[in-house]
Design a protein with these regions (language model features):
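Hydrophobic alpha-helical segments, especially transmembrane helices
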Residues: 3-6, 106, 295
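Domain-terminus/edge residues, biased toward the C-terminal soluble/receptor-binding domains
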Residues: 197-198, 211-349
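Active-site-adjacent loops and short helices of periplasmic peptidoglycan-processing enzymes
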Residues: 25-218, 227-231
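Residues in and immediately flanking transmembrane alpha helices
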Residues: 17-18, 118, 331-334
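Sec-dependent N-terminal signal peptides of Gram-positive bacterial secreted proteins and lipoproteins
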Residues: 2-25
């Protein structure tokens, strides 16, 4: 070992004496590596600080008198809403506008289901492929390739395929809306508004970042509720694996797996009450998640926006544990007499 150290020292001396350019280059590389490490640490520190600050922010529903106190979460916005009544059981900054990322596809699929049949053919145009970046979620479709609408919707919900989302929007727009992709986006906005979404704007069908593409946790819960009431949507979203049959341009099957970890029984983040959901992520939106669950005779939608990685699952679990512990659906006719109701009315007076 000593011989190696001496040799290394001698070599360094020669480099410094005879080839200063090389020595300087080595120093610059070492400095660059140190700077890069510092930047990585700074990014991690910034994330940790943001998470800590968000975790410390108040929960809006905790401010309601006599309301059960809900848990702190890392997400910037979160909500649990009863999908049948619209009652909000838990809310943290649920009305603030944020980027949804791929949970946009819940609305895209809901829009397509208003018109399309599962047997419809979806044809992939050059436009539906050409915008893709190397790291975008996709299933490798080719221009001119054809799949069924059913396979396409599975591609959107299970694999979060961005080119498939574009192609579905384009094909539904052409076949049913007397237009194309733009008309489908208009219909997404119309349906969103019809559902009571007052703070959302949609400019694409896949959720890739655009400054003008945004929603709120509350609006997203409304959309999730409407989607979950659709039988076809539930069938698609509760599927864990689907095989896209061979196509006119691809001889092999494409195997699609559900991305939502809370739906897989063998996964660490599995949640027995969870029935359906959609994941999302962009650099700007950070992690987003929508989850539909059932329990205590309730159907609930949970949404978290702008959180980090698996925090989306732990946040959702905490919110659902809180909701199922503190709330249940009751039949007022069975629980109250007329005198109870009259007494409550007199108190309100």
């Amino acid at each position: 070992m000593k011989a190696k150290k001496v040799l290394s020292g001698a070599l360094a001396a020669i480099l410094l004496t005879l080839t200063p350019g090389v020595a300087v280059c080595a120093e610059e590389m070492a400095g660059q590596e140190q700077t890069e490490n510092t930047q990585v640490l700074s990014a991690q520190e910034q994330e940790n600080q943001e998470k800590a600050a968000s975790y410390a922010e108040k929960i809006d529903t905790n401010e309601i008198s006599n309301w059960p106190q809900g848990p702190a979460i890392y997400a910037a916005s979160g909500i649990v809403m009863d999908m049948n009544s619209g009652a909000v059981l838990y809310a943290k900054k649920a009305e603030e506008k944020r980027y949804p990322a791929s949970i946009t596809k819940v609305l895209s699929v809901l829009t397509a289901l208003q018109y399309a049949k599962m047997s419809d053919t979806v044809v992939f145009s050059e436009d539906s492929i050409s915008f893709l970046q190397w790291d975008d979620a996709q299933i490798g479709m080719k221009p001119g390739e054809e799949i069924s609408m059913e396979s396409a919707l599975y591609g959107m919900l299970l694999a979060s395929a961005n080119e498939v989302s574009y192609a579905v929007a384009e094909n539904v727009g052409k076949q049913y809306l007397n237009g194309g992709y733009a008309e489908f986006i208009e219909e997404m906005n119309r349906i969103s508004q019809e559902l009571g979404c007052t703070s959302s704007n949609w400019v694409n069908a896949n959720g890739l970042h655009d400054d003008n593409h945004y929603t709120t946790a509350h609006d997203m819960a409304r959309i999730a509720a409407a989607a979950y009431q659709n039988e076809e949507f539930r069938r698609l979203e509760t599927t864990l694996e689907y095989k896209v049959p061979p196509t006119n341009l691809t001889a092999e099957e494409r195997i699609l797996d559900q991305n939502h970890k809370m739906l897989w029984p063998e996964n660490y983040y599995y949640y027995a009450n969870a029935k359906a959901g959609k994941t999302g992520y962009t650099d700007q939106s950070k992690t987003t998640l929508v989850t539909m669950a059932e329990g205590n005779d309730m159907q609930l939608a949970a949404v978290v926006l702008h959180t980090y990685g698996v925090d989306a699952y732990t946040d959702t679990r905490f919110m659902y544990d809180y909701a199922f512990t503190n709330f249940e659906r009751l039949n007022l006719r069975e629980c109250e007499t007329s005198s109870d109701i009259e007494s409550q009315i007199s108190e309100l007076r």
